[in-house]
C-alpha cells in the first residue's frame, strides 16, 4: 500500500476546515488542520508535508505570508491559496494556485490537489525496452531509398 500524501490545511473557519478534512481523507489523503498560521508552521517543521492549502484570511497571519514562509522552508512544497476576496491579484503571492473560496467545487479543489502532487512527484517513470539493432531479419527493418 502506498503511503498517504499529507496535506496541511490552514483556515480560521473551523467548519470549512472540517469539511475540507473529510473531503481529503475520503480521497485517501492525510489532512492536518490548523486554525492559525503559527500552528501550521509548527506542523511544517515537525512533519513531512506534501501540499499546503491556506485561506488568505487567517486570524494571526495573512495566508499569503504563510505560503511565503512555507516556500522559504520547503521550496518544492506546492500551495493553494483560498480567498473570498476576488482582488487577490493585488497581492504578491507565492501560491501555485489561487481559488476563490465560495466558487470552488470539491471536484475543482481535488483536481488542483492531484495536479500539484503529480507535478511535485514528477511524471511516472515508464519502462523502456532496450533498443535492438535493426537487421534485415527483423520485422521493423526499413530500407532507405535514394
Regions found by a protein language model. Name each.
Residues 59:
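The feature encodes the CheY-like receiver
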Residues 36, 62-65:
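Acidic catalytic/metal-coordinating carboxylates
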Amino acid at each position: 500500500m502506498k503511503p498517504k500524501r499529507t496535506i496541511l490545511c490552514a483556515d480560521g473557519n473551523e467548519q470549512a476546515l472540517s469539511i475540507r478534512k473529510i473531503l481529503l481523507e475520503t480521497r485517501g489523503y492525510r489532512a492536518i488542520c490548523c486554525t492559525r498560521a503559527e500552528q501550521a508552521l509548527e506542523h511544517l517543521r515537525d512533519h513531512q508535508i506534501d501540499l499546503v492549502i491556506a485561506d488568505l484570511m487567517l486570524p494571526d497571519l495573512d495566508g499569503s505570508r504563510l505560503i511565503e514562509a512555507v516556500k522559504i522552508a520547503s521550496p518544492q512544497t506546492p500551495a493553494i491559496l483560498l480567498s473570498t476576496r476576488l482582488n487577490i491579484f493585488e497581492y504578491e503571492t507565492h501560491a501555485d494556485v489561487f481559488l476563490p473560496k465560495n466558487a470552488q467545487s470539491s471536484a475543482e479543489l481535488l483536481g488542483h490537489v492531484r495536479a500539484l502532487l503529480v507535478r511535485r512527484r514528477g511524471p511516472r517513470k515508464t519502462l523502456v525496452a532496450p533498443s535492438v539493432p535493426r537487421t534485415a531479419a527483423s520485422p521493423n527493418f526499413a530500407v532507405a531509398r535514394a
